[in-house]
A protein has these predicted regions:
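A short beta-turn/loop motif at secondary-structure boundaries
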Residues: 38-41, 112, 134-138
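Conserved glycine-rich acetyl-CoA-binding loop
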Residues: 77-91, 98-100, 104, 110-118, ...
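Conserved catalytic-core motifs of GNAT/GCN5-like acyltransferases
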Residues: 67, 108, 126-142
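Acetyl-CoA-dependent GNAT
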Residues: 2-3, 7-79, 83, 90-96, ...
Length: 150
């Protein structure tokens, strides 16, 4: 399986939304949120996809907040999970953040999402806080992770 990572484009929107719909732990953006992201062409936002010969297998979206990057959404297709795709996506995002002078990367993750938490901890993200009741759909806390880059 040959994998490649590239910047997402508006043509990727249907595949991104389809993948996200089947990823229970993804952020579940609306079509309007994705469309606005692609329309804005903002240097403060980065969207990457990982794909193979059969198409899109995952994506990550981050935004710049005062020299820190916030990971807003990350998802990997069900059949592609546990094969290192999330690790590769996150590695590429961190490389880009470092290359653009970021001081740190942070994110929120569901307390119950053990697989994602293990991925972030593998990259040396540290738990830096908790947002009580952050996920309203299940009244679940968010764990805030942060990785210093400098």
């Amino acid at each position: 399986m040959k994998l490649s990572i590239r910047s997402a484009a508006s043509a990727d929107l249907p595949a991104m939304m389809s993948l996200e719909k089947h990823a229970a732990t993804a952020a579940h953006w609306t079509a309007q949120q994705y469309e606005a992201m692609f329309r804005a062409h903002s240097p403060e936002r980065t969207a990457l996809i990982i794909e193979d010969e059969s198409g899109l297998q995952g994506f990550v979206i981050a935004r710049v907040v005062h020299r820190e990057w916030e990971i807003e959404n990350i998802a990997v297709a069900g059949p592609a999970r546990r094969r290192g795709l999330g690790t590769r996506l996150l590695g590429e995002l961190l490389d880009q953040a470092k290359g653009r002078g970021a001081d740190a990367v942070f994110l929120e993750v569901r307390e119950s999402n053990r697989a994602a938490r293990a991925l972030y901890e593998k990259w040396a993200f540290l738990e830096s806080g908790r947002r009580r009741g952050y996920y309203k759909d299940q009244d679940e806390d968010a764990i805030v992770y942060r990785l210093g880059l400098t």
